[in-house]
Amino acid sequence: MSDILKQICDVKVQEVAAAQKRMPFADMRRDAESRVLTRDFVGALRAKIAAGQAGVIAEIKKASPSKGVIREDFIPADIAQSYADGDGKGVSAACLSVLTDKQFFQGSVDYLKQARASCHLPVLRKDFMVDPYQIYESRAMGADCVLLIAACLDDAQMAEMEQIAHSLDMAVLVEVHDGAELDRALRLKTPLVGINNRNLRSFEVSIQTTLDLQKNVPADRLLVTESGIGSREDVKAMRDAGIHSFLVGEAFMRAKEPGEALAKLFA
């Protein structure tokens, strides 16, 4: 685990402890289990791909540790609606990803709630899961999918959190950065496997990471390439290789109209 990732995960452990003092585990679980049906995250991606389009998970992200503030004019509901509309001709996001980490990414649970309420798209809670409590918390706030980062968790933790998520009708996106993590991720049941092109130690980005690891991903899994997709050439390289699902944030967040930027990149 890289130094920054360890630092983030250590903070998450503290945040979970504080959250459980405000709302005990049993109460959070009860709240999560009482929520209405989720939106079909995997189905939304597959529907776009079946229609010959890219399945885009469009990210709502204000800032990051490596780049600082990415978008000053930050209104999550408007951004979400822009992604859902796209170019108005069918090229639009399949799903949303919303950063809820406050300390490192200037995210918020409220941003997720606002984004989800403003459109019909399924929503991924983008945060750093270190405890089962957070899975229940994610459903309680309205998330349709959770992110499990292999570098943050051991096999038993991933399996437990996946089981809880699936019991709540949530999808799971498991994120890997190298071959060893991919091997571990493939032991899970989820069809969603994300390959992050960002090296968590150097923060360098190379889309070759996805292309190199793709050959080890079974055909029945839905491979999502994450980070570093910023040009039509990047998209073409991935789609030519048979990769049709993308998680993109920064390239859209820097545009005046994020949805139009999405449509232009994936037209």
From Swiss-Prot:
Record-linked InterPro entries: Aldolase_TIM (IPR013785), Indole-3-glycerol_P_synth (IPR045186), Indole-3-glycerol_P_synth_dom (IPR013798), Indole-3-GlycerolPSynthase_CS (IPR001468), RibuloseP-bd_barrel (IPR011060)
PROSITE patterns in the cross-refs: IGPS
Keywords annotated in UniProt: Amino-acid biosynthesis, Aromatic amino acid biosynthesis, Decarboxylase, Lyase, Tryptophan biosynthesis
Catalytic activity: 1-(2-carboxyphenylamino)-1-deoxy-D-ribulose 5-phosphate + H(+) = (1S,2R)-1-C-(indol-3-yl)glycerol 3-phosphate + CO2 + H2O
Pathway, per record: Amino-acid biosynthesis; L-tryptophan biosynthesis; L-tryptophan from chorismate: step 4/5
GO BP annotations listed: L-tryptophan biosynthetic process
Record keyword Cell wall biogenesis/degradation present: no
CDD domains: IGPS
Pfam families given in the database record: IGPS
Gene3D superfamilies in UniProt: Aldolase class I (3.20.20.70)
EC number, UniProt record: 4.1.1.48
Keyword Amino-acid biosynthesis among UniProt keywords: yes
Domain of life: Bacteria
A molecular function GO annotation: phosphoribosylanthranilate isomerase activity
NCBIfam families documented for this protein: PRK00278.1-2 (NF001370), PRK00278.1-6 (NF001373), PRK00278.2-4 (NF001377)
HAMAP family, per database record: IGPS_B
Family: Belongs to the TrpC family.
Protein name: Indole-3-glycerol phosphate synthase
